Regions:
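Acidic, polar loop-rich interaction surfaces within structured domains
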Residues: 1-91
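Conserved functional hotspot residues or short segments at active or partner-binding sites
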Residues: 65-178, 184-186
Length: 186
């Protein structure tokens, strides 16, 4: 591997006027403490030329009912403390991605920030659809509490929409694997 960046760290900040709750899917054991994001002494991952990283979040938009958003009664003996962070109302930004990395021969990191506006799922790439199908399959295999109403048929249908970039046949092999798992489950 030819390293192009070392100590690569990613931090996602969701806009509370758009998102009431979120959950990182996978990577639970690789979470970085907030204070370690800016700490150049804290080791993180390396990125090689041509490599990419994908992280999936389950997002509950503001105003959407969810069984996974905890509703807590007001406290009787304590006053509700005003949160330090206030939602940015009026902003169409869904989140901001913060990326920190060091060049291979440097010891001081650089930070990039990129806001993301929700496009309501329009123009989703086939790579994203395929990765989402793989993530859904993982939730089914683990029988995750968060799998919701997901089915093997949905995984297959989503993956089939993402077969256009499959020169080596890996995506078709994934489909066969899901079909086999579905057959074993029945």
């Amino acid at each position: 591997m030819h390293t192009v960046a070392k100590d690569v760290k990613l931090q996602i900040e969701f806009n509370p006027s758009q998102v009431q709750a979120y959950r990182l899917i996978g990577y639970e054991s690789r979470l970085l403490k907030d204070e370690d994001f800016n700490n150049d002494a804290k080791d993180a991952g390396e990125m090689g030329a041509g490599h990419s990283v994908t992280a999936f979040y389950e997002v509950v938009p503001v105003g959407v009912e969810s069984n996974f958003v905890n509703k807590v009664d007001d406290l009787k003996y304590q006053k509700k403390v005003k949160p330090a962070l206030q939602p940015t109302t009026g902003s169409k930004e869904l989140l901001t991605v913060k990326l920190r990395y060091k060049a291979p021969d440097e010891d001081i990191s650089k930070k990039l920030e990129l806001p993301l506006v929700d496009n309501k799922g329009n123009n989703v790439s086939s790579d994203f659809r395929f990765a989402a199908a793989v993530a859904m399959f993982g939730q089914l295999l683990r029988d995750s509490d968060f799998k919701g109403d997901a089915t093997y048929a949905q995984v297959i249908a989503m993956a089939k929409t993402a077969l256009d970039n499959d020169e080596k046949g890996y995506r078709r092999e994934f489909l066969r694997l899901v079909e086999t798992a579905d057959g074993l489950k029945q």
